[in-house]
């Protein structure tokens, strides 16, 4: 192979060498030519010499040169021309001499000319030579260049060819080397193969030889081989014969095995066929069973309905006969057993929820009684039954229902199952308190008892009544216990935290679930508490609560198991309890229905006067498997039932009120007997038949109500009918009434329930809509003052119940408001989850953006990350590296990236930034920067109050419409101007001394006891934190941007306003009023309008344009119509943290901006939180037991838990001012129409439901919606207060500030007698006055009295509660009727966990019912809810 290649290369090399030789030869020839070419140098030299010689003659004077030339020419033959010339020049005829011709002048001339010609010719020749030489030289040079380039090209070619040759030679050499190595290997392999062949041959030979040997030597019996050669023929034959025999035997064996194999195959085939037949038969059976199951899919519903029906029947039978309640009802127990399994989870969850929220004392007591009785397992309730026949009996069903909403309570179906009613009450202060409260509340009617059990989840109705009378004393104990319980013992916080962590680890319960259901805290807070528990002595009262709850949680294994169940069921989705599944799917509706049924059953389990109605309703539901049909059946039946009941109730209300009910006097010893009896009757009707009573009020106007309102009312009525409507409804109604107003939108169902229960609450006009309705009924009732008293009592009772609700919200709302953010989309996950992120840089950017936009970490955590402030702070300060984060741990960082890039959507992207303004803006104009100077004049204050109100309410978008419009009315146009104006002022302002300004501002604020929050919100439009920062660390003027200078300009303007302090105080009052109004419905919109200071409606008139403009400097406030607010509230019920889609839908349907909707939700949530806080502080009513459970000691009247009202600050705690100013209006109003007053009061309460925004709806139908406002502005507000805080104001002891307000009767009895609506109004008015009074207004608002009215009242069953005097107000910690307890009451301001639980239950049930109605009216839903 190589040879030919080498030859070809050789040929190429030879050719190349030839070409190179040729090139060299050509080059040499060129060189030779050049060398041979004549040298131009000598010719040049000759030319030069000639030139020299020519030039010489001209310089030679001697003529020598001429002679030489002449001689030279002489030598040369003379040219003819010369001769001719010579001849011509001698015309004379002289002939030259023969030999010598001497030159003459002519000759010289001739020679000169000749010489010159010759020279010229020579020079020409020389030039030509030069030219030719130059041309030849150039050509030669060009040739040389060409030859050089050719030489170079050939050399490069040669080098290239050599290189290629070398490469190819190398490659060929490599190939040859490879071939040689392969050849060597092949040779080696061939050698190995040969060796193998040889070895194989040897083996073959050995094998052959061995075979031969084997053949030759068959084995003998001994196995010895005989050599073949030695074998004889006969032996070989014998061996062969033996082999043949062996072969035959083996063949036989093989045949037998084949036969057995065939048999086995046949048998197995038969067996397989049999099994297949059996399988087919069983699959058919399974299909049939599945069909049956599908056909009986509603079995659970039917079962639960049947259990409810049984419970209701028992309850209805037992309602009239408390004795029956005392005896365990086997059927009821059975029903409950049946009911509980289905409800187990429901119960467990509420129980958990409730238990965490209970006070330690209450928790202990309740848990002891309820929690310990395995609350969660359905079976557990029965044991309580045996212990306490009462509890198992209808009470249990009631509790069961209550369980749904309030787990723990429910579980201990009988609050004191193990103890005798008396023992238990005494033993469990809280329980007794609650149980007694309810028991007392209903003790008289017996129906009510059913209610308390529902609420108290374990109160024995029968014993409760009995106990309720003794209750007074237990109440005192409970209160004391309530106050002291937590402090009684020093807890080892480290040990408790350790045990809790152990339990959580052991049962795989997440801290989030534990915090959500047990402590009511976020995961971050729980983690902090468990990781670093502080010593008990260093904890505040609030700080001790989690440890008390943890201790109670650890006290019963059932709590842990229940929580584990919740963790398992809710793994991964803890949402606010009020969140509901989307209405879209039938499954969701079904689940809502089932939950609602269970909740209703559990809540109303035993006591419904309208049990038949409720029964029919459940049946309807069961019968129609489709959720909508079921709901509609329920609603239809409820409507029919209620209409019938309404008629009866109306008659009863007019007539029964006339009858005096003996129990009522015990309940309200102080009320006038006649009015008392009537009132009691009303109360009982409302309580015992409360459902019907309140429902009647509601129902009268059913036709007038919107579909939503109607459905809600019906559902409430159904609930009331199912359970002891009166008790339940009242409880709810009062709770709702009190809270729903404040929470106007907490849930339509809540408010509506309040509406139906409005009457018990004294808010016959439970809601705006209901209010209108209720007034009619009440108008009729109003005819009798006794009825009014009854209503008042109902209100009081309701307040008691309602009060419970307040706490409910505190416990409930926080969790409801727990940050929930929409989940990340799969695209977002994919985009960011696996992309490496620098968490340090990301958190730095987030912190910068938060700081730049003034967004607090709490809001950022809630809106963007779905985390608590603690978690956000921890994450931003110490971010883990991305690689160390789990998928869950990366989510917050993904959300941060999305937020930074504005990809989270308006809801989250904007919310955080806007929230600060909204949330920070607080009640005063958040965005409209109340002008610095705007410190409003009184009217301005009013306006500002409206501002504050509207701002605050705008936060919740619930400002009363009148106010909103008024406050806005003045400001809207000016706000834009104002914004421009303040900015111009800032731009043109001379340099200010920021330090001195802030110093003066601090001095003014401290001297006048004004809070930074109020100042910031009303004057600067900033949050308290921003104001504190500005005042403590003011930057120099030159370092501030225009925006940063604005607050200092505003401060300067405010300092220059002579009325700045008064305006701020007025604003504070207005703000408090607004807060009260919104929060507790204490001040009706009307009341605000009526009070001069409250004239938020004429804010603009009094405001100076500049102030107005300043106040509006930021943005005009958005005023929402009542319908819009209602729709937003309903949407909030369904989705407190709406998704972007929901926000857009709402904005589209309501024709609002998305920012407006977002801000409304944010503000409303903030308001809910504040209210919850206030409720928490207010949960302990200060009632004077001596005055009656409802009576607050005068001292307590103005207890000032300033913290309770968000607006109250240090300034809030001023000596109460006399609130008699309002008495005048009260008096006239009362005189004018006591009946109306009541109606209006109820209306107002109804209004409260709607919040500030819809007062008009509440008016008497006759009057028109505006009537209540106008007529009862004050009374309404006051009435609200009185209703809310009947204790303080209605208490037997007259209000010190408003002595005239109390009836002599009240004073005498020491009870708040509501016999006179006037007195009631006056009390309420007095409360209003006190509210108005700046000193007390905050305190009043937050004061337990108000609280009482607001939350304590309900809790204590407010002074008005129908509960027996002995019965401790449900809420009053010190239930002892004696005045001594009043003092005790005073100290204990803790939230009553029982009330909280009640509220939670109510909220749960309300939300479920609300969802239910939503599902029922899905077609109409779009108009009013989302």
Curated annotation (Swiss-Prot):
It comes from Mus musculus. SUPFAM superfamilies: Homeodomain-like, lambda repressor-like DNA-binding domains. One of its GO terms (cellular component) is nucleus. It is found in: Nucleus. Residues 1233-1245, 1260-1274 have a biased composition (Basic and acidic residues). Residues 482-569, 828-915, 983-1070, 1113-1172 bind DNA. Residues 77-104, 351-419, 460-488, 599-628, 653-676, 743-769, 904-977, 1177-1392 are annotated as: Disordered. Its main location: nucleus. Residues 131-311, 587-655 form a coiled coil. Transcription factor involved in the control of neuronal proliferation and differentiation in the brain. Regulates dendrite development and branching, dendritic spine formation, and synaptogenesis in cortical layers II-III. Binds to DNA in a sequence-specific manner. This is Homeobox protein cut-like 2. Residues 608-628, 1338-1350 have a biased composition (Polar residues). GO terms for biological process: negative regulation of DNA-templated transcription; negative regulation of transcription by RNA polymerase II; positive regulation of dendrite morphogenesis; positive regulation of dendritic spine morphogenesis; positive regulation of excitatory postsynaptic potential; positive regulation of gene expression; positive regulation of synapse assembly; short-term memory. The modification Phosphoserine is found at residue 81. Residues 397-408, 460-470, 743-757, 910-928, 965-976, 1318-1332, 1351-1364 have a biased composition (Low complexity). Keywords: Coiled coil, DNA-binding, Homeobox, Nucleus, Phosphoprotein, Repeat, Transcription, Transcription regulation.
């Amino acid at each position: 192979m190589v040879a030919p290649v080498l030859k070809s290369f050789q040929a190429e090399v030879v050719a190349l060498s030839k070409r190179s030789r040729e090139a060299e030869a050509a080059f040499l020839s060129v060189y030779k030519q050049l060398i041979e070419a004549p040298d131009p140098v000598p010719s040049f030299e000759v030319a030069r010499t000639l030139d020299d010689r020519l030039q010489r003659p001209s310089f030679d004077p001697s003529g020598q040169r001429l002679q030489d030339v002449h001689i030279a020419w002489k030598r040369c033959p003379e040219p003819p021309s010369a001769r001719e010339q010579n001849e011509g020049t001698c015309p004379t005829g002289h002939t030259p001499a023969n030999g010598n011709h001497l030159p003459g002048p002519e000759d010289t001339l001739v020679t000169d000319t000749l010489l010159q010609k010759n020279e010229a010719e020579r020079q020409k020749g020389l030039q030509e030579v030069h030219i030719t030489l130059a041309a030849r030289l150039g050509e030669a040079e060009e040739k040389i260049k060409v030859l050089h380039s050719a030489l170079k090209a050939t050399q490069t070619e040669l080098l290239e060819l050599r290189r290629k040759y070398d490469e190819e030679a190398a490659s060929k050499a490599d190939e040859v080397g490879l071939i040689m190595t392969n050849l060597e290997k092949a040779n080696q392999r061939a050698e190995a193969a040969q060796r193998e062949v040889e070895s194989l041959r040897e083996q073959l030979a050995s094998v052959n030889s061995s075979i031969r040997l084997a053949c030759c030597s068959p084995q003998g019996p001994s196995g010895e081989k005989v050599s073949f050669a030695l074998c004889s023929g006969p032996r070989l034959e014998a061996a062969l014969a033996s082999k043949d025999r062996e072969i035959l035997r083996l063949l036989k064996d093989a045949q037998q095995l084949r036969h057995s194999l065939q048999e086995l195959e046949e048998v197995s085939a038969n067996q397989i066929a049999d099994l297949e037949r059996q399988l087919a038969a069983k699959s058919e059976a399974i299909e049939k069973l599945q069909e049956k199951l599908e056909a009986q899919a509603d079995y659970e519903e039917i079962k639960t309905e049947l259990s409810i029906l049984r419970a209701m029947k028992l309850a209805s039978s037992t309602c009239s006969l408390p004795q029956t309640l005392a005896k365990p009802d086997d059927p009821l127990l059975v029903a409950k057993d049946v009911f509980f399994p289905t409800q187990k989870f429901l119960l467990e969850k509420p129980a958990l929820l409730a238990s965490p929220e209970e006070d330690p004392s209450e928790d202990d007591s309740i848990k002891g009684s309820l929690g310990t009785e395995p609350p969660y397992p359905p079976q557990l309730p029965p044991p309580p039954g045996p212990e306490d026949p009462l509890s198992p009996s209808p009470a249990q069903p009631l509790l069961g229902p209550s369980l749904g909403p309030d787990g723990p309570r429910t579980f201990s179906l009988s609050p004191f199952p193990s103890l005798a009613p008396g023992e238990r009450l005494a033993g469990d202060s809280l329980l007794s308190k609650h149980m007694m409260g309810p028991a007392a509340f209903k003790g008289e009617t017996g129906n009510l008892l059913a209610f308390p059990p529902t609420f108290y989840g374990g109160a024995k109705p029968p014993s409760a009544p009995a106990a309720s009378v003794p209750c007074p004393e237990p109440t005192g104990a409970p209160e004391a216990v309530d106050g002291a319980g937590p402090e009684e013992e020093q807890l080892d916080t480290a040990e408790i935290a350790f045990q809790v962590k152990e339990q959580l680890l052991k049962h795989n319960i997440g801290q989030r679930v534990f915090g959500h259901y047990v402590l009511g805290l976020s995961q971050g807070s729980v983690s902090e508490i468990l990781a670093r528990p502080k010593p008990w002595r260093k904890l505040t009262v609030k700080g001790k609560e989690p440890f008390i709850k943890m201790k109670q949680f650890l006290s019963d294994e059932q709590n842990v198991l229940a929580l584990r169940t919740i963790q398992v069921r809710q793994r991964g989705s803890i949402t606010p309890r009020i969140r509901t599944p989307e209405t879209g799917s039938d499954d969701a509706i079904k689940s809502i229905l089932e939950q609602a049924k269970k909740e209703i059953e559990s809540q109303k389990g035993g006591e419904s006067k309208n049990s038949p109605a409720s029964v029919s309703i459940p049946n309807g539901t069961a019968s129609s498997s489709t959720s909508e049909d079921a709901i509609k059946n329920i609603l239809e039946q409820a409507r029919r039932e209620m209409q019938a009941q309404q008629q009866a109730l109306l008659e009863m209300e007019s007539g029964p009120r006339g009858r005096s009910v003996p129990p009522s006097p015990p309940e309200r010893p102080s009320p006038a007997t006649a009015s008392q009896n009537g009132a009691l009757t009303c109360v009982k009707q409302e309580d015992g038949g409360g459902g019907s009573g309140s429902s009647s009020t509601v129902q009268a106007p059913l036709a007038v109500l919107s579909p939503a309102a109607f459905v809600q009312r019906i559902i409430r009525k159904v609930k009331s009918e199912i359970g002891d409507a009166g008790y339940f409804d009242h409880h709810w109604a009062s709770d709702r009434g009190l809270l729903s107003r404040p929470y106007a939108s907490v849930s339509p169902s809540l408010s509506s329930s309040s509406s139906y229960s409005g009457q018990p609450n004294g808010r016959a006009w439970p809601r705006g809509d209901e209010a209108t309705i209720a007034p009619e009924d009440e108008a009729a009732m109003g005819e009798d003052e006794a009825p009014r008293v009854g209503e008042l009592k109902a209100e009081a009772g309701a307040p008691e119940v309602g009060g419970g609700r307040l706490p409910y919200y505190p416990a409930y709302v926080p969790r409801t408001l727990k940050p929930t953010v929409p989940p990340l989309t799969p695209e977002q996950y994919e985009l960011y989850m696996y992309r490496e992120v620098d968490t340090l840089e990301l958190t730095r950017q987030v912190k910068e953006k938060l700081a730049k936009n003034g967004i607090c970490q709490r809001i950022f955590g809630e809106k963007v990350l779905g985390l608590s402030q603690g978690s956000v702070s921890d994450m931003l300060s110490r971010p883990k590296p991305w690689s160390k984060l789990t998928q869950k741990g990366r989510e917050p960082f993904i959300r941060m990236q999305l937020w930074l890039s504005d990809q989270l959507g308006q809801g989250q992207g904007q919310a955080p930034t806007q929230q600060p303004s909204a949330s920070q803006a607080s009640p005063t104009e958040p965005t409209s920067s109340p002008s610095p100077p705007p410190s409003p004049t009184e009217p301005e204050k009013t306006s500002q109050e409206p501002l504050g109100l509207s701002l605050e309410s705008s936060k919740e978008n619930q400002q009363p419409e009148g106010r909103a419009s008024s406050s806005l009315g003045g400001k809207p146009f000016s706000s834009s101007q104002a914004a421009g104006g303040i900015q111009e002022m800032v731009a043109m302002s001379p340099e200010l001394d920021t330090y001195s300004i802030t110093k003066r501002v601090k001095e003014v604020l401290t001297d006048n006891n004004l809070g930074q929050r109020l100042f910031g919100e009303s004057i600067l439009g900033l949050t308290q934190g921003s104001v504190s920062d500005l005042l403590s660390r003011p930057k120099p003027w030159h370092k501030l941007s225009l925006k940063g200078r604005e607050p200092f300009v505003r401060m300067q303007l405010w300092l220059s306003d002579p009325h700045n302090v008064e305006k701020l105080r007025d604003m504070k009052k207005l703000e408090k009023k607004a807060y009260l109004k919104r929060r507790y419905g204490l001040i009706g919109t009307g009341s605000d309008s009526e009070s001069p200071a409250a004239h938020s409606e004429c804010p603009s008139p009094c405001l100076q344009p500049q102030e107005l403009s300043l106040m509006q400097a930021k943005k005009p406030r958005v005023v929402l119509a009542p319908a819009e607010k209602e729709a937003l509230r309903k949407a909030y019920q369904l989705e407190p943290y709406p998704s972007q889609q929901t926000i857009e839908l709402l904005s589209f349907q309501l024709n609002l901006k998305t920012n407006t909707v977002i801000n409304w939700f944010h503000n409303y949530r903030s308001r809910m939180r504040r209210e919850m806080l206030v409720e928490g502080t207010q949960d302990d009513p200060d009632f004077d037991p001596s005055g009656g459970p409802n009576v607050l000691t005068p001292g307590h009247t103005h207890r000032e838990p300033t913290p309770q009202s968000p607006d109250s600050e240090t300034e809030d705690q001023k000596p109460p001012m006399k609130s008699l100013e309002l008495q005048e209006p009260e008096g006239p109003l009362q005189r004018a129409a006591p009946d109306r007053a009541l109606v209006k009061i109820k209306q107002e309460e109804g209004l409260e439901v709607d919040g500030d925004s819809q007062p008009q709806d509440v008016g008497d139908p006759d009057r028109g919606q505006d009537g209540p406002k106008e007529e009862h502005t004050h009374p309404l507000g006051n009435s609200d207060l009185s209703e809310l805080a009947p204790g303080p104001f209605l208490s037997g002891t007259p209000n010190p500030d408003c002595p005239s307000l109390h009836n002599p009767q009240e004073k005498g009895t020491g009870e708040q007698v509501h016999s006179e609506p006037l007195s009631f109004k006056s009390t309420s008015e007095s409360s209003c006055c006190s509210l108005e009074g700046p000193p007390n207004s905050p305190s009043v608002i937050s004061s337990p009295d108000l609280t009482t009215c607001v939350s304590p009242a309900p809790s204590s069953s407010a002074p008005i509660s129908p509960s027996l005097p002995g019965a401790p107000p449900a809420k009053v910690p010190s239930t002892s009727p004696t005045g001594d307890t009043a003092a005790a009451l005073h100290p204990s301001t803790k939230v009553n966990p029982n009330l909280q639980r009640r509220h939670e239950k109510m909220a749960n049930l309300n939300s479920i019912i609300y969802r239910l109605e939503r599902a029922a009216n899905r077609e109409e839903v779009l108009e009013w809810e989302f």
